[in-house]
Amino acid sequence: MFNVVRNEPAPASLANKVKYDSQDVWDALSRVFHKKCYICETKEPQDINVEHFFPHQGDENLKFDWNNLYFSCGRCNNIKLAKYDDLIDCCDTNVDVLRAIKHVPPVTPYAKKLKIEAQLNNAKTNLTSELLDKIFNSTHTPNKTVSASFLRKKVFSQYNLLLDLLDEYYSDTVLPQEKEIALERMKLLVKPSAPYSAFLSWCILEDDELGPLLNDFIGVAE
């Protein structure tokens, strides 16, 4: 999960209270969330939903409230449903959602699990951690088991880009300018607009040298 700034005004169509997923809503959400599912961080997912962060349950105000509409992939929306209705909010500027939950990437493309660990001991963080664990490690149906495996492989592919840069950065034969370029490329991988940025950010945060160097670039909403 990544930090988001909702810097777009409410799309005009919402004022009519007819549809909450008109084209202007989609366009605005795509910009605000960088075309990423706010839960799993998949970029440009094929199956997308306008999700109600708090289930509206027939409440017209919640149904058409711009601040309650989120960019979600169909899979995450299906798993979340109404059960997970008290999550930490990635659009809340008072909460650093990235640092609230540790994301550990899989060590191989077909690793059976990846680690999600709450860093704060409160109900919202624990529930969000539980949801993320289910998203990435689900085995509750055959379909979800297979799709979770595909998702972990995508995370690993992005992680592998970071591994290549780390190998270059820490090489005994690296030139100063090459080291600087590797560092700049790492900054691109931890930007909120990058896929699975939470996983790569945590790798950097836990590195004794790179953590202090890139700390100020991590978790900064775009």
Residue ranges and their predicted role:
Residues 18, 39-72, 80-101:
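Histidine-centered nuclease catalytic patch
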Residues 26, 66, 196-199:
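Tryptophan-centered motif/residue detector
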Residues 76:
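DNA major-groove recognition helix of helix-turn-helix/homeodomain DNA-binding modules
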Residues 81-171:
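Domain-level detector of nuclease and nuclease-like folds
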Residues 1-36, 58-64, 160-163:
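Short, charged surface segments at domain edges that flank catalytic/cofactor-binding sites
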Residues 130-222:
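C-terminal, charged low-complexity interaction regions
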